[in-house]
């Protein structure tokens, strides 16, 4: 969706007074919900965000430090609007090229190297969060290539710009204020660099996720998801634990599907309220034993009683997988089948 850009009307003294009164009565998302964003009104919108931050208990020192000199970043909006929207075609792109790019030899090797470096902490992290370390490493590898690509955008500027632009105003306004709360908690301002969309650190958390999830895994008093391996892996582990990861269950296993298999007979009839196009590519839930009775055989270590769904990312006759509920936890982190499959396959390779 695009937003038509227009100039805001001149801010007269009367409007300024009304703006100040409105800021105390309603959140920025409602006050500006019907406005078209242009750089001219950014400073006025920042006054609203500052008022909301004060109302949520953010210190004046932090508000001033984080908003003084903040400017609208047109590049952020350009990048946001260039993101692919809903496809008009019925055939998704092939998975194989994505897999080759994201489960490559270099990423596998780097993941194994980090695994070796944190081997002494692996047991403690896995015991606390119930998630295999290779899965946590694969998320880290998928998000930032183990910290090599964390992003260099100023987070305050990016989040404020996205909030002001307006298509997802409430989401980004809340994330901007969460960023200020991070500073109030002691996160140094110079750490606040990341993606244009506001994600940061090794696991690419949003500010609200950092406040809710980030862990001080090494016990030094600071949840450092920028430079601490243990804090990074512990924080991803906490996310997966809270999202419902089931210990002792794989994310999925490869499967063989017989020729002439009746795929229509096992097609899902559910309409997921979250990421419907992602979930539509999966089958009905059946136990591994029930799949075997239909001729679909699991090719990995998984219990016969485990409920799974079938996915063939490149269509019939191509690689197939039986996916457990833990796969849905990976989707909770990033709702893309190609992302989730690649995380699972990368984890398998790291663990070899």
Predicted features along the sequence, with ranges:
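N-terminal secretory signal peptides that target proteins for export/translocation
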Residues: 1-8
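Substrate-binding/active-site groove segments that recognize
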Residues: 154-163, 176, 200-215, 236
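An acidic, Gly/Ser/Thr/Pro-rich helix-cap/linker signature
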Residues: 34-126
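Bacterial N-terminal signal peptides
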Residues: 12-26
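Secretory-pathway/luminal and periplasmic proteins that interact with or process carbohydrate-rich
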Residues: 72-79, 144-153, 165-169, 185-191, ...
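Acidic, glycine-anchored loop motifs typical of Ca2+
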Residues: 217-225
């Amino acid at each position: 969706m695009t937003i038509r850009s227009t100039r805001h009307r001149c801010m007269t003294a009367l409007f300024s007074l009304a703006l100040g009164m409105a800021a105390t009565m309603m959140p920025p998302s409602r006050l500006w919900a019907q406005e078209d964003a242009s750089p001219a009104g950014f400073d006025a919108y920042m006054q609203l965000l500052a008022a909301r931050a004060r109302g949520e208990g953010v210190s004046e020192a932090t508000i001033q430090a984080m908003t003084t000199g903040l400017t609208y970043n047109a590049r952020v909006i350009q990048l946001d609007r260039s993101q692919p929207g809903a496809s008009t075609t019925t055939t998704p792109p092939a998975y194989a090229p994505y897999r080759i790019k994201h489960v490559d030899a270099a990423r596998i090797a780097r993941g194994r190297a980090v695994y070796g470096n944190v081997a002494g902490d692996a047991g403690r992290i896995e015991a606390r969060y119930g998630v295999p370390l290779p899965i946590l490493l694969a998320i880290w590898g998928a998000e930032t290539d183990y910290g090599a690509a964390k992003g260099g955008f100023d987070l305050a500027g990016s989040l404020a710009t996205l909030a002001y632009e307006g298509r997802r105003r409430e989401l980004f306004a809340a994330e901007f204020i969460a960023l200020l709360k991070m500073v109030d908690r002691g996160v140094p301002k110079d750490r606040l660099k990341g993606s244009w969309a506001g994600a940061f650190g090794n696991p690419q958390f949003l500010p609200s996720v950092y406040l809710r999830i980030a862990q001080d895994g090494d016990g030094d008093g600071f949840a450092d998801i920028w430079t601490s391996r243990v804090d990074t892996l512990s924080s991803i582990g906490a996310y997966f634990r809270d999202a419902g990861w089931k210990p002792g269950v794989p994310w999925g296993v490869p499967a063989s599907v017989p020729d002439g298999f009746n795929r229509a007979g096992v097609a899902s009839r559910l309409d997921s309220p979250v990421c419907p196009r992602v979930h539509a590519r999966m089958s009905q839930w059946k136990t591994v034993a029930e799949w075997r009775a239909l001729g679909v055989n699991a090719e990995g270590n998984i219990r016969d009683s485990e409920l799974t769904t079938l996915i063939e990312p490149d269509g019939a006759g191509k690689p197939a997988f039986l996916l457990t509920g833990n796969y849905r936890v990976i989707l909770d982190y990033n709702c893309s089948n190609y992302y989730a499959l690649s995380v699972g396959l990368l984890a398998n390779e790291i663990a070899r």
